[in-house]
Every structure is written in C-alpha cells, then in structure tokens.
Amino acid sequence: MTLSGEQEIPRRTSRLILLSVCIGQTIVGLDQRAITVALPTLTATFHTSFTTIQWTILIYDLVLIGLIITMGRLGDLFGRRRLYSLGFLIFVIGSAVGGLSQTPGQLIFFRAVQALGGSMIAANGRAIVSVNLPPQDRGRALGLTSTAFHIGFLIGPALGGFLIDSIGWRWIFYINMPFSLCGAYLAWKIIPETRTNEKIAVDVPGALLLFLTNGLFIYAIDQLPRVGWHHPRFLLTLSLSVIALLFLLRVEAKTKTPILTLSMFRSRLFSAGIASLFLIAGTLSAINFLLPFFLQNLLGYSPSQVGWIIVADSVIIMIMAPIAGSLSDRFGSRLLCTTGCAIVAVAQFFLATLDLNASLLRIMLPLIVWGVGWALFNAPNQSSILGAVSPEKIGAAAGMIATTARTGGAMGVALSATLFGYLLAAAGLSGSQIESPESWRTAPETFMGAFATTIFVLNFFTLIAVLFSAVRGEKPQA
C-alpha cells in the first residue's frame, strides 16, 4: 500500500485535515436530523401525504446503505482525497437544488443526490484520519470525528426548527453549502492523496442488489394502504424484492469481498446483536418520524419548539454513552443490552399513552428515559458484535453494524407511516384529510388514536429485541 500519509505531516496540516473531516462528519449528522423537524411543514407546503414525504428520509438512507461500503473501497482504489472532495461538491449541489425544489418528487431526487455525496464523505473521512495522522494521535482524532458527527446529530433538530420558523424550510438545505465548500477546499488543498496499490474487488452487484432489495420492499409497503394486499402492483413489487434478496444472498456467498459477510451470522452473539439492533433502530427511527407530526399538528408546538424537545434523547445519549461502555466492561453486554431494550420499551409505552393535554414535562420524560435505554443498549451491543468476530473481520462487522442500523431505520419509518395511514383510512378519513394539518386539529382524537396504536405496535418489536438481547450469550459461539 502506498500512502503519501506515511511521510511526516506538520502538526498544523494534521489539524486542518482533522478539521476537514470533522466538518464532513458534522454535516452528515446534522443533515440526517434537521429534516425530521421539517416533515410536517413539507407535507403542508407541497400538499402531499406523510407517506410521500417519508421518502425524503427513506431515499437518503437507501442510497447510503447501498453505497457507503462501496465508496470506501473506491476511495482505496482511486484516491481518498479525490472521492472525499467530490463528495462535498455533490453534497453542495444536492443542497442547493434541494432548497429550490417545487414538488415532492424533486425534493426526494435531490435528497438522493445529497446522499450520494454523503456516502463519499462518510466512507472516506475516518480512513483519511487513520492514514494521515500519526499513531499516537489517531485514537483521539477518531474520537473527535465521532463527537463531530454526534454534535451535528444533536443540533440538527434545534437548528432546523429555528431556520424553519425564522427564514423558511429551504434554509435547512442552504445552511449546508458554506460549510461543505469550506470542507471541500480544505480537503483538496491540505489532505495528501492516498490510495492502495493492492487489487481490491468492489462488490458492485452486491451494492446494487442490496439497494434493490430494500428499495423494492419499502416501496411495496408504501403502496399497501393505497392498493391493498391483493393488488398486482403490491404483489409484483414484493416478489421482485424477494427475488433480489435471493440473488443478493447467492452473490454475497460467492464473492471474495462481499458487502455482507454472511459467515459472521454463525455466531449467536453476532446474529442476536444484529437482530436486536435492526429492531431497536427501526422503532426509534419510526418514532422520530411520527413525533414531529404529533407535536406540531396535534399539540400546536412550533418547529423550533419541536426541535428543542426531540433533542432531549440525544443529549442523554451523549452523557450516558461513556457510562454505558464502562458498565458493559464490568457487567457484560447481555445484561446492559437487555436492560437498555427494556427501558426503551417502557419509554415507548409512556409515549403511546400521551394525550392531547400532555404537558411538556409529560412529553420530555419518556424521551429522556428513551435516551437512557438507547445509550445502555447501543455501545455494549456494538462492542459485543465486534467482539464476536475474528480480528480480520472487524471491518466487515463494523460495516454490518452501520448497514443494519440504517436498514432497520428505513424499514421502521416505512412500516410506521404505512400503519399510521392505514389506521386513519380505516377510521374514514380521506387522503386529502390526512394530508391537511387542519384535519389533525378538527379530528384530533382520530389522529391521536392512530398515533398511540402505531407506537404500541412498534413496542412489540422492541420487546422482541429484548428477547434477542437476553439470549445472545456473553462469549462468541464457535
């Protein structure tokens, strides 16, 4: 492997490299969360349904799921600086034209463009730090990049709400542009080019099949409330998703550098950890999708107020994550993960029992408890998954963690939106009534009932995650 980063790099240059990567990580984290607060506003602006507007989130996740590992390997082959800088520029283009969108279709397409750039940034940023910084600084630097992502993830809802209330929803896209251009400039001017001379096979068929499997399944679920179980469109799309999945499993079993290393699932510790992560990520993403609609359209909070409310769990997670890691070292992952999942289930139960007169404290408490549960689950679960595989497979296991979390999140959003829409339609509301924020206020009990029922159903999946965590064991299974 030939690395220009093997030469001694001045400390000032190292700091600027780290700054560029931290900018990228912050933007990726911020962009994921800022749009959640805008969902009710976007639904009203475009006079569309929340089942349509959910695709602004789903398309972003689907593109990242399909491309992030591939972009990392392309960076190894063609140069990490090149792909990282290009990622910033593509992200700028997606942000600029996304803010100009006049239809939901345009917005969804430009979110996909953002995700294309985001996959290049996310896949190559930490590799650039690892290659270019000296070993004695590497751990701290990687910790800072992780902190940068979580800072963006934390401030995203509050910043997004403030921008929507003050200057309009389009600025949640425009705000990315100056920072992305700064990151691109630093990347191109400061970061040395690094690549490998080794031959690396890129699993393009696997990436494409993974995208098709998830995309077709989510599209089938999205169509279900409108066309029904027996409609040819639903049956055809679902069948194509299953066929794509079968081809994916076949391809991944044979390729030398698969996106999904299926042999790792022979470990009960690994497979139970992945299964519980998929379920918990799905329920949490689903609630993050539904909660802004509940708070804005039913309880009358402004976007900026909603942004500050849903930040609560992220603050708790940042505080609790180091504590959870220490507790995991002392008590083991099974106890911490099972307890964390159970706490999440309790928090979701109390969210489902909220009513139209719920006070701010009554809303915040379940979110705080939810953050505690997620923190107790997440770090120990990741540690146990990585500990269940041999050292040479740790990179593949880390990729599987990221892919699972995003796939679970996308599935959770799709299923919750479908169920919520189905319950409203079953209550006699037409599509135009469901789309209108005024209808939420004229028939609040109907929407409140659908919200509560959807959360209760999601909680069923959380309880299954509790069971997976409880049976995982503590040591890798041979």
Feature map (PLM): residue ranges:
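Intrinsic disorder in cytosolic terminal tails and internal cytosolic loops
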Residues: 1-13, 437-442, 470-478
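A residue-level signal for alpha-helical anchor/packing sites in multi-pass solute transporters
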Residues: 128, 132, 162, 186, ...
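Flexible cytoplasmic inter-helical loops of multi-pass small-molecule transporters
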Residues: 192-208, 255-260, 478
